[in-house]
UniProtKB/Swiss-Prot annotation:
BP GO annotations: COPII-coated vesicle budding; ERAD pathway; mRNA transport; nuclear pore localization; positive regulation of DNA-templated transcription; positive regulation of ER to Golgi vesicle-mediated transport; positive regulation of protein exit from endoplasmic reticulum; positive regulation of TOR signaling
Molecular function terms, GO-annotated: structural molecule activity
Pfam families the UniProt entry points to: WD40 (PF00400)
Lineage: Eukaryota, Fungi, Dikarya, Ascomycota, Saccharomycotina
Subunit field text: The COPII coat is composed of at least 5 proteins: the SEC23/24 complex, the SEC13/31 complex, and the protein SAR1. Component of the nuclear pore complex (NPC). NPC constitutes the exclusive means of nucleocytoplasmic transport. NPCs allow the passive diffusion of ions and small molecules and the active, nuclear transport receptor-mediated bidirectional transport of macromolecules such as proteins, RNAs, ribonucleoparticles (RNPs), and ribosomal subunits across the nuclear envelope. Due to its 8-fold rotational symmetry, all subunits are present with 8 copies or multiples thereof.
Protein name per the record: Protein transport protein SEC13
Keyword Disulfide bond listed: no
Family of the protein in this entry: Belongs to the WD repeat SEC13 family.
Gene Ontology CC: one annotated term: nuclear pore outer ring
Superkingdom field: Eukaryota
Membrane association type: Peripheral membrane protein
Subcellular location, record wording: Cytoplasmic vesicle, COPII-coated vesicle membrane; Endoplasmic reticulum membrane; Nucleus, Nuclear pore complex
WD repeat extents: 7-46, 51-92, 97-140, 143-193, 200-242, 250-289
Keywords annotated in UniProt: Cytoplasmic vesicle, Endoplasmic reticulum, ER-Golgi transport, Membrane, mRNA transport, Nuclear pore complex, Nucleus, Protein transport, Repeat, Translocation, Transport, WD repeat
């Protein structure tokens, strides 16, 4: 385990390893992003990225097929795109379509191309396509009237309607209206249509995380200010969603983040109690605590 201290002067909001686990990006209320090289238990700060004018909430690495590229989002309403070439980092794009804090950024599964999903306190989420000629093509959707706190992609799957096969692009969003919503891309209209609304939380939904597993059953984890985590499941990408409380009693504090392992069978949760807990589904379909890490 790598422990990094004194990386930022204020609260750290996100820390993400790249595809190969060799680079770590962190972001903070100090308005900066730090890039580290990680090798085993050691790490080295290689660059500090400045460009945001407010706290930086989240960062996300693009798939390496697109190059060494990082997206960041901030309270300043901006999404910035950063690229490393020949050991030097530079800002290559600024994306400003939201009128309030941008709370999350997530690159799409690489099969869809360079698409970036952004959620904002202005009540909207957007999906922007970065074209080879340098232009962008955003789709902007009204999602949760009083703010979108988080959004994520479903893993890449193929939909076959009997005539042709095409990628089934789906998105989950979590809002300040306590709701989780599922959206599906409609290629004819070039927009995302509301497919399902999942109502079970009693306070703001803070994060949504779709399991990367490509099993016939979809798993979506949602965490909330109400101190609960819900696992939603759906069979074969259609039909009703089934709700399961991760544990019957509430967590000791608000839950901020949920993250699945690459294989999609272990769920990590972090919250206001400064602990990370790991959870795994047993053979009876019950969720069990697998480990607890004090931060």
């Amino acid at each position: 385990m790598v422990t990094i201290t004194n990386a930022h002067t204020e609260l750290i909001h996100d820390a993400v390893l790249d595809y190969y686990g060799k680079r770590l990006a962190t972001c903070s209320s100090d308005k900066t992003i730090q890039i580290f090289e990680v090798d085993g238990d050691s790490h080295k700060l290689v660059d500090s990225l400045h460009g945001h004018e407010g706290p930086v909430w989240q960062v996300d690495w693009a798939h390496p097929k697109f190059g060494v590229i990082l997206a960041s989002c901030s309270y300043d309403g901006k999404v910035l795109i950063w690229k490393e070439e020949n050991g030097r980092w530079s800002q290559i794009a600024a994306y400003e379509v939201h009128s309030a804090s941008v709370n999350s950024v997530k690159w799409a599964p690489h099969e869809y191309g360079p698409l970036l999903l952004c959620s904002s306190s202005d009540g909207k989420f957007s999906v922007v396509e970065f074209k080879e000629n340098g232009t962008t093509s955003p789709i902007i959707i009204d999602a949760h009237a009083i703010g979108v706190n988080a959004a994520c992609w479903a893993p890449a799957t193929i939909e076959d309607d009997g005539q042709q096969s095409q990628h089934l692009r789906r998105i989950a969003t979590g809002g300040a209206d306590n709701l989780v919503k599922i959206w599906k891309y409609n290629p004819e209209a070039n927009t995302y249509l509301l497919e399902d609304t999942l109502a079970a939380h009693a306070d703001w939904v803070r994060d949504v995380a779709w399991s990367p597993s490509v099993l016939p059953r979809a798993y979506l984890a949602t965490v909330s200010q109400d101190r609960t985590c819900i696992i939603w499941t759906q069979e074969n990408n259609q039909g009703p969603w089934t709700k399961t409380l991760l544990k019957e009693d509430k967590f000791p504090d608000v839950l901020w983040r949920a993250s699945w392992s690459l294989s999609g069978n272990i769920l990590a949760l972090s919250g206001g109690d400064n602990k990370v807990t790991l959870w795994k589904e047993n053979l009876e379909g019950k969720w069990e605590s697998a480990a607890e890490i004090e931060q």
